Amino acid sequence: MPLLHSKPTLGYLLEGEGRRIAYLTDTVGLPPDTLNWLLREPLDVLVLDCSMPPQPQVPRNHNDLNLALQCIDELQPTSAVLTHVGHTLDAWLIEHREELPGNVSIGFDGCEL
């Protein structure tokens, strides 16, 4: 699925064993066609790019937490995993992790879905 980035990037939808997992990295928001295509059936897991804490302006190439949570709200997955986490988001989460919705977690090396 096409994503929004300064270079062509694609997301992936994995379907099998009764589960739907979307893997969407290197994007800032979602193109309308991609969003609509993903909305055709519920997602079990959404793995989504989120590189920065909330920003005062719209970021370029990668989601900040505001945009990531907006995508999660639109897609309504059972669970969401934020990935492509930058140092500034990691530092922000030390003091604000409780501000994440209950179905949102932070990905890490070795994370299993």
Predicted regions and their residues:
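Core dinuclear metal-dependent hydrolase active-site scaffold
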Residues: 1-33, 109-113
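Cap/insert and terminal regions of metallo-dependent hydrolase folds
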Residues: 29-112
